[in-house]
Each structure stands twice: as C-alpha cells, then as structure tokens.
Amino acid sequence: MTFLESNIDELVTANHPYRKILGLIDFKELTKELRKCYSNLGRGGYPIESGFKALLLQYMEDLSNREAQRFLEENLAGKLFCGFGLKDQTPEHTYFVDLRQRI
C-alpha cells in the first residue's frame, strides 16, 4: 500500500490532542444553528462542520488565514480534525474570511 492509498485515520496517532477534542465536542450539534447561514441553492461548498473546525483550529494554533490554508494542506492531524481526506481539496485563505463574515 502506498502513502496516498493509506487512510488518514491510520496515519494520525490515536492519542493526538485533536482526536481528544473530537471525542469531547459534538460538532454536528454545535453547528446546527450555523447551517441556517447556508443556502441549498448553488454549488455545494465545504461542510459547515469542517469550516467551523478549521476556524477553531486556526484559533487554537494562532494561524493567519494563509497559515491556516497551508496548515490544512500539509498537516495530517489538521486534515483529520476538520474532516478532510488525504486527497481532498482544503480551503483557500479567503474561505476563512468569508466564513467568519457569514457566521
């Protein structure tokens, strides 16, 4: 099996702090009200849970928008935390600005 065929879940240690946060917080429930900020029309974007987790990660790691973009591109634990797979496209820096304004 090659690296890209691996499951991201297998590549992040079981005791990683981000996993602990995922086990403590029900993000679906937490973001229930935020779903109202999204329309069902138009092309789909990133799931609101992923966006909210990305903003939380940006805050916890003290990242600028561009740093958050790069962090999610390069950091496997960050991808796992936000619900992105190894090959998934992650948000560009402008996404973080847009999401904060929306919510």
Where are these regions (language model features)?
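Short alpha-helical elements
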Residues: M1-I103
